[in-house]
C-alpha cells in the first residue's frame, strides 16, 4: 500500500493506493529542487542581473511615476518577498518616484484589505498606494490598440498613464495560456472584461495549441504578448516556486526574455511523461489555488492528460469560496444536455463570449469524456448541480470511482496520482 499526503486547503488529505493498482505518480521536479540560495537572495540576484534589460533602478531614473502590477489573492506569489525588493530597487534609482501597486484581479473578485495584509505584510499594505483593478469598470479603461485576434485592447489606465510599468508574478504551467507569468500581468491581469472575453473565446480555447506548456502557435499567448508590449510593460520579476510555495528561482528583466528563461527552467522541472490509468487522483495544490471550483478546473486538466477515456478523475480541492464564478456555475447548472451546452459555446463568435465561458467550456470537455468526483468542502448540491459527483472524503471517492468503473466492466482499475495538478506539464 502506498500512502500520499495530498494538499487540501491549508491542510492535507490522506490517499492510500494498493501497490498492484498504482500506475504512476506524476510530480514536478520543482518539489525536490534545491535552490542555490535563500528566497530573498534569489530575488536580489535576479534584480541585480536582469535579462535583456537595464536594472530597474536605472529604469527609474528620470521617471515621475511607476505602476507595479501585482498578482491578486488567488495566486501564491510570495509578494512579501518580491515587493519590498522591487520598492527598494526603484527608490534606490529614484527616491522621489511615485509608486502605485495595481492589483491584477483579472476577472476575479476584488482583493480585501485583510488579504492585502496577508500577502504583502502590514507595513506595505498600510503605507503604499494600492489600486484594485475591476475589469467591469469601463471608465477605468483606455484603448491601446487591436489584438492580433481582432479584439479591442483595453487596459486599466493606471497601467497606461504612468512613466514606468513593472510587474511581479510567478511562472507555472497554465491550462490554456501555456504558462503563467510575464505578459499575463497585463492580459488578463489588468485588462477590460471586453478584452478578456475576446481573448478567451471558444475558438481559441478549443485550439490544440491552447494547452498546458504550449506557447508556440498559442493564439491566447500571442494576444497577451501584444497587450503587454503595447502597454509598455518595461520590467518583470517572476519567480518559480515549490510545493511549499517557496521561491526556488527568480527571473527579472525584459517581459519576453526573462519570461522565456523562466519558462525553460520551469519546463525542465515540470515536464512529466503520462502514465495512463483508469483513475487519476489530483489536487489544485492546496491554498490559495483551491479556493473555488473555477480555479480547480486547472488541476483537472493535468488529470485529463493521463486519464484513459471514460475513466474517473478525482479532484481533491477545498473550494472554501464555492464555485468562484456565477456564470460558470449557472452554465453547468442549466445544462440539461452537456453536449448541447458545449455546442452552444462553440457556436459563439469571438465577440459573443460571455463571462467564465472558457472555464465552462473546459469543464464540459472533461465531463463529456470522464466522470469527475470532487472531494471538497463546497456544498454537495453545488457539485451535483455542475454534473460532478460529490464525495465527503477521499476514501468515499475511491469507492465511488471503483463503482463507476465496475458498471463499465472494469475491476481493480489502475490509479495514477498527480499530487499537485497545477505544477506539472503532462506529455
List each model region and its residues.
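C-terminal non-catalytic interaction/assembly regions of soluble proteins
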Residues: 296-297, 301-427
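A glycine-rich helix N-cap at a beta->alpha junction
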Residues: 116-141, 340-350
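N-terminal amphipathic/basic leader segments beginning at the initiator methionine
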Residues: 1-46
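Glycine-rich phosphate/diphosphate-binding loops that line cofactor/substrate pockets in enzymes
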Residues: 51-67, 91-97, 271-279, 306-308, ...
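Short glycine-rich or small-residue beta-strand-to-loop segments that form or flank ligand, phosphate
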Residues: 65-76, 100-106, 281-283, 314
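Histidine-anchored nucleotide/phosphate-binding helix
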Residues: 75-96, 101, 296-306
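Gly/Ser/Thr-rich loops at beta-strand to alpha-helix junctions
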Residues: 71-83, 105-110, 170-174, 285-289, ...
Amino acid at each position: 500500500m502506498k500512502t500520499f499526503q495530498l494538499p487540501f486547503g491549508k491542510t492535507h488529505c490522506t490517499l492510500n493506493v494498493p501497490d498492484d493498482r498504482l500506475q504512476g505518480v506524476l510530480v514536478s521536479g520543482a518539489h525536490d529542487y534545491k535552490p542555490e540560495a535563500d528566497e530573498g537572495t534569489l530575488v536580489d540576484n535576479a534584480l541585480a542581473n536582469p535579462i535583456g534589460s537595464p536594472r530597474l533602478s536605472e529604469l527609474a531614473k528620470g521617471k515621475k511615476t511607476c505602476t507595479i502590477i501585482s498578482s491578486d489573492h488567488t495566486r501564491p506569489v510570495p509578494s512579501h518577498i518580491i515587493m519590498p525588493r522591487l520598492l527598494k530597487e526603484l527608490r534606490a534609482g529614484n527616491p522621489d518616484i511615485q509608486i502605485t501597486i495595481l492589483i491584477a484581479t483579472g476577472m476575479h473578485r476584488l482583493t480585501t484589505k485583510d488579504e492585502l495584509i496577508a500577502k504583502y505584510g502590514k507595513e506595505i499594505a498600510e503605507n503604499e498606494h494600492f489600486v484594485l483593478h475591476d475589469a467591469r469598470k469601463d471608465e477605468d479603461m483606455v484603448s491601446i490598440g487591436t489584438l492580433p485576434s481582432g479584439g479591442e485592447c483595453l487596459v486599466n489606465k493606471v497601467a497606461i498613464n504612468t512613466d514606468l510599468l513593472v510587474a511581479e508574478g510567478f511562472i507555472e504551467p497554465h491550462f490554456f495560456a501555456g504558462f503563467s507569468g510575464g505578459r499575463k500581468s497585463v492580459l488578463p491581469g489588468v485588462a477590460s472584461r471586453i478584452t478578456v472575453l475576446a481573448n478567451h473565446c471558444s475558438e481559441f480555447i478549443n485550439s490544440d495549441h491552447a494547452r498546458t506548456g504550449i506557447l508556440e502557435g498559442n493564439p491566447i499567448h500571442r494576444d497577451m504578448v501584444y497587450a503587454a508590449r503595447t502597454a509598455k510593460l518595461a520590467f518583470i520579476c517572476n519567480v518559480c516556486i515549490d510545493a511549499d510555495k517557496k521561491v526556488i528561482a527568480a527571473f527579472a528583466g525584459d517581459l519576453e526574455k526573462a519570461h522565456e528563461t523562466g519558462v525553460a527552467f520551469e519546463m525542465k522541472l515540470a515536464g512529466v511523461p503520462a502514465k495512463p490509468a483508469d483513475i487519476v487522483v489530483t489536487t489544485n495544490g492546496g491554498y490559495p489555488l483551491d479556493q473555488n471550483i473555477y480555479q480547480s478546473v486547472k488541476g483537472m486538466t493535468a488529470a485529463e492528460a493521463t486519464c484513459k477515456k471514460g475513466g474517473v478523475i478525482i479532484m481533491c480541492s477545498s473550494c472554501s469560496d464555492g464555485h468562484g464564478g456565477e456564470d460558470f456555475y449557472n452554465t453547468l447548472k442549466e445544462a440539461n444536455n452537456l453536449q448541447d451546452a458545449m455546442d452552444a459555446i462553440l457556436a459563439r463568435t469571438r465577440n459573443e463570449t460571455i463571462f467564465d465561458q472558457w472555464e465552462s467550456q473546459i469543464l464540459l470537455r472533461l465531463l463529456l469524456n470522464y466522470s469527475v468526483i470532487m472531494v471538497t468542502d463546497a456544498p454537495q448540491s453545488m457539485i451535483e448541480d455542475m454534473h460532478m459527483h460529490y464525495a465527503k472524503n477521499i476514501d468515499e471517492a475511491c469507492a465511488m470511482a471503483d463503482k463507476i468503473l465496475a458498471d463499465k466492466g472494469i475491476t481493480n482499475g489502475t490509479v495514477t496520482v498527480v499530487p499537485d495538478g497545477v505544477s506539472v506539464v503532462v506529455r
